[in-house]
Swiss-Prot record:
Residue ranges annotated for the Ig-like V-type domain, each copy included: 22-126, 127-219, 220-312, 313-415, 416-512
Signal peptide: 1-18
Tissue specificity comment: Expressed in the liver hepatocytes of male and female GH transgenic mice and in the liver of female, but not of male, non-transgenic mice.
SUPFAM superfamilies given in the database record: Immunoglobulin
Subcellular localization, as worded in the UniProt entry: Secreted
Gene3D superfamilies xref list: Immunoglobulins
Cellular compartments per GO CC: extracellular region
Keyword Secreted recorded: yes
Description of what induces expression: Induced in hepatocytes during the proliferative phase of liver regeneration. Induction requires a continuous pattern of GH (growth hormaone) secretion and an intact GH-GH receptor-signaling complex.
Glycosylation sites: N44, N89, N192, N369, N381, N389, N485
Pfam families with a match to the protein in the record: Ig_2
GO biological process terms, semicolon-separated: growth hormone receptor signaling pathway
Protein name in the entry: Alpha-1B-glycoprotein
């Protein structure tokens, strides 16, 4: 896997199972509307589907249901679907997709023969015109005397006039930048903003977009610092650890720090808003927590707030192994109870790590610093997913930072069925044809892969990896075929292999 792909996976940009042959930058085509006349936009309308890489096959989908497919003799970058006059028969929400031709002659699964679905285009045939989409870019906050941000307004119909309004302020703001169906408005003041558009000067404005709230912060928001990979692993030959620092917007410079000390470690930036640090554990004179911060072009005198701290552990396994005990000591534990795992060492003033055996790696799941000779780790509200073999390890907090080998393992066995997540529907009552159905799956532990499953189907309809205990799952383009009962479940990310139960179902009722 490439370094950039690793970083993207770490921060949540994942593909569904079996999608390794899908297109990357060209995987999502663009769809927009071109009226014959902006004076009467619904009198004769054409939808244009464009893709980054040439193809012979284009498909137009209305209200989540197949409508039209064309196969051309030669490869092209776009195709025009003529809808004509818009009536109740051809109004609705449209998306398109394009055929994928692999660079070599190989067999592709059915789903991998198509790009991702395009953006949605709403065609109503009436006024007011459909609302545009609006969002803040690159962040939804500003600082005193700092860089402005944009409110971006996206309209599916080309050639329109864009308008931005601030709540409580008279008048409209005209765009500062404009390109291919998107306009950007520079924002210098906090407030609530919405955009709309006109097809001609005497026309009625469209419905306003959803509100975009721009906040005022006293300083640049902190970046995120995290360990590359799902868990920390300790082994005697390990000399380097990789930390990733990601800013909320493009940065000119990053710093990796321990307390007030800036570490002179060269970093590599795969993107303008992120940097990777390769930390030589042998050269550290302090095992204390790491933080990172950034500063931006034109504002080099102002540093952001520090990230949340990240602690590391390593060990040369030269010191005596600690002893791990469990309270209660029974291997048969009841779900919902609390277990204390006590790690005892022969000396004081150490950093302790609780390890859990994966397949095959032994990884650190908790860390504690102690001024005494022991540390007590707690597992709360335990369930079958906590069953496994645990051990502990420690390291000195003064040079040369020697460490122990792992303790003898302690097995925890929790009774009962696996825990069930909770599936939440983020809509009310019914889902209209062509809309998205967005769910949120609430689990119990972080670092899992969550799946949306439908009654009667084995293959999940959506998959999302998360470093937290919940994830959003969505049906992108709901058609009549999507009606039914849905549940969610989750499985551990490597190196663990546990699986949750199935949530109670949520019914999707499709209207229209």
């Amino acid at each position: 896997m490439s370094l950039l792909a690793t970083v993207l996976l770490l921060w949540g940009f994942t593909l569904g199972p079996g999608n390794t042959l899908m297109l990357d930058s060209g995987s999502e085509p663009k769809l927009w509307a071109e009226p014959q006349s902006l004076l009467e936009p619904w009198a004769n309308l054409t939808l244009v589907c464009a893709v980054d890489l040439p193809t012979k096959v284009f498909e137009l989908i209305q209200n989540g249901w197949f409508l039209s497919q064309v196969r051309l003799e030669t490869q092209v970058l776009s195709y025009r679907f003529s809808l004509g006059a818009i009536t109740s028969n051809n109004s609705g929400i449209y998306r398109c997709r394009c055929g994928v031709e692999p660079p070599v002659d190989i067999h592709l699964p059915a789903l991998n023969k198509w790009t991702m679905l395009s953006n949605a285009v709403e065609v109503t045939g009436k006024e007011p015109l459909p609302r545009p989409l609006a969002h803040a870019d690159p962040v939804d906050w500003i600082t005193p005397g700092g860089l402005p941000v944009y409110v971006m307004c996206q309209v599916a119909m080309r050639g329109v006039t864009y308008l931005l309004r601030q709540e409580g302020v008279d008048g409209v703001q005209k765009p500062d930048v404009q390109h291919k169906g998107t306009a950007g408005f520079l924002i210098y003041k906090p407030g609530n903003y919405s955009c709309s558009y006109l097809t001609h000067a005497a026309g009625e404005p469209s419905e306003p977009s959803d509100i975009v709230t721009i906040k005022m912060y006293a300083s640049q928001a902190p970046p995120t610092l995290c360990l590359m990979g799902n868990y920390l692993m300790i082994y005697p030959q390990k000399t380097y650890e990789t930390l990733a620092c990601k800013a909320p917007r493009n940065a000119a410079e990053f710093q990796l720090r321990q307390g007030g000390k800036v570490l002179k470690i060269h970093g590599f930036s795969p993107t303008r808003d992120a940097i990777l640090y390769y930390v030589n554990l042998k050269e550290l004179d302090n095992p204390g927590p790491f933080t990172c911060r950034y500063r931006m072009h034109k504002y080099m005198h102002v540093w952001s707030e520090d990230s949340k701290p990240v602690e590391l552990m390593w060990s040369d396994e030269t010191l005596q192994a600690p002893v791990l005990t469990a309270e209660p000591s029974s291997r048969d534990l009841e779900p919902g109870s609390t277990v204390q795992l006590r790690c005892t060492a022969p000396v004081s003033g150490l950093r302790f790590g609780l390890q859990r055996q994966g397949k095959p790696e032994l990884v650190v799941v908790q860390m504690l610093n102690s001024s005494g000779t022991e540390a007590v780790f707690e597992l709360h509200n335990i369930s079958t997913i906590d069953s496994g073999n645990y051990s502990c390890i420690y390291m000195e907090q003064a040079p040369p930072f020697s460490g122990s080998s792992s303790s003898e393992p302690v097995e925890l066995r929790v009774n009962g069925p696996p825990p069930k997540p909770r599936l939440e529907a983020l809509w009310k009552s019914t889902v209209h044809l062509g809309q998205e159905a967005i769910f949120r799956c609430h689990g119990h532990v972080p670092r899992v892969s969550m799946e949306l499953v439908r009654e009667g189907f084995k293959t999940p309809f959506a998959v999302a990896s998360t470093r937290s205990t919940s994830a959003y799952l969505k049906l992108l383009f709901v058609g009549p075929q999507h009606a039914g009962n849905y549940s969610c479940r989750y499985t551990a990310l490597p190196p663990f292999t546990f699986e949750s139960g199935i949530s109670d179902p949520v019914e999707v009722i499709v209207e229209g």
